[in-house]
Amino acid sequence: MRPGRPLAGFYATLRRSFRRMSKRSKNKAKKERVPVEDRPPTPMPTSQRLIRRNALGGGVRPDAEDCIQRCHPLEPALGVSTKNFDLLSLRCELGWCG
């Protein structure tokens, strides 16, 4: 940095980032964007399906797994945390859900 210009590096970085941002207009970006409503829900990764542990400490029983897939298909896709998923699988294990 040169003396007398303590913010020269900051301004250079700012200029570079503005140059990068201005390559595509906001309206063009909006037109290219895929609306969320049109997209199908993200399926839960198969690797997480049966290996998740429930609150009882074991793997989810197959009938509870069916219940989770049948009655709560979107909940894992919407970002349910491991703790909430454990409670959900326990609810299905004990037959407390619909």
Curated annotation (Swiss-Prot):
Top-level taxon of the source organism: Viruses
UniProt region (Disordered), positions on chain: 19-47
Biased composition regions of type Basic residues, renumbered to the chain: 19-31
Family: Belongs to the lymphocryptovirus BNLF2B family.
Name of protein: Uncharacterized protein BNLF2b
Species annotation: Epstein-Barr virus (strain AG876) (HHV-4)
